[in-house]
From Swiss-Prot:
Residues 1-29 form the signal peptide. Induction: By glucose. Belongs to the FAM3 family. It holds the Pfam family ILEI. GO terms for biological process: apoptotic process; insulin secretion. It is unclear whether the N-terminus residue of the mature protein is Glu-30 or Ser-46. Keywords: Apoptosis, Cytokine, Disulfide bond, Glycoprotein, Lectin, Secreted, Signal. Glycans are attached at residue 208. Expressed at high levels in the pancreas and, to a lesser extent, in small intestine and prostate. Also detected in stomach, testis and fetal liver. In the pancreas, localized in the islets of Langerhans; in the testis, found primarily in the round spermatids; in the CNS, found in the Purkinje cell layer of the cerebellum and in nerve cell bodies of numerous brainstem nuclei. One of its GO terms (cellular component) is extracellular space. This is Protein FAM3B. GO terms for molecular function: carbohydrate binding; cytokine activity. O-glycosylated.
């Protein structure tokens, strides 16, 4: 190819390339929104700064259950005391019946009585089982509760040293399997029904004895708890 022809060919290629580049730029300008360059740069930088979406916190359930109780049931949670500073607690339908904040928990056996048909609290009381003669009064208190009552019992500190046969028999009559196995500072929780039967699948009782080789606290076993949902309308 002659030098003149070669030069003309290169010039044509250059002009064609320039036209293609110009047209591509024109199309790109038409497609991109009219946004200031500073905003574009800010948006690019902020991509890495945007917060990561998090799952919403789970909704709090009655008595701090992990999952809600079905309709037409009562939610309950019993927690024994643990050590000197972790107080026993009885929660029913998201109301703390006995606990540190309510100021009605003490050493011994703590009892809350609820009217099963209305869900209203009838009485709360504690009985010191380390000092004093409180076993007889506790037995009478339990025996005097009306029919169609729910009884919730939890220990704080020691619930056995002054516990006598009459009180043990009264609690055993409500269905307890562990009351006669209580030892010094045993952690114990118990739910009972008077005048009707609870479903067999409901967890009613748990006990944890003091054992120096495995106690969580110095001289005390770990606290224990049970929770559940009691159906309404039982006979």
């Amino acid at each position: 190819m002659r030098p003149v022809a070669t030069g003309i060919f290169k010039a044509l290629v250059f002009i064609f390339s320039s036209l293609c580049a110009w047209y591509s730029g024109y199309l790109l300008a038409e497609l991109i929104p009219d946004v200031p360059l500073s905003s574009t740069l800010y948006n690019i930088r902020s991509i890495g700064e945007r917060p990561v979406l998090k799952a919403p916190a789970p909704k709090r359930q009655k008595c701090d259950h992990w999952s809600p109780c079905p309709p037409d049931t009562y939610a309950y949670r019993l927690l024994s005391g643990g050590g000197r500073d972790k107080y026993a607690k009885i929660c029913f339908e998201d109301e703390v019946l006995i606990g540190e904040k309510t100021g009605n928990v003490a050493r011994g056996i703590n009892i809350a009585v609820v009217n099963y048909e209305t869900g209203k609290v009838i009485a709360t009381k504690y009985f010191d089982m380390y000092e004093g003669d409180n076993s007889g009064p506790m037995a009478k208190f339990i025996q005097s509760t009306p029919s169609k009552s729910l009884l919730f019992m939890v220990t704080h500190d020691d619930g056995s040293s002054k516990l006598k046969a009459q009180a043990k028999d009264a609690i055993e009559a409500l269905g307890s399997k562990e009351i006669k196995n209580m030892k010094f500072r045993s952690s114990w929780v118990f739910v009972a029904a008077k005048g009707f039967e609870l479903p067999s699948e409901i967890e009613r009782e748990k006990i944890n004895h003091s054992d120096q080789s495995r106690n969580r606290y110095a001289g005390w076993p770990a606290e224990i708890q049970i929770e559940g949902c009691i159906p309404k309308g039982l006979r």
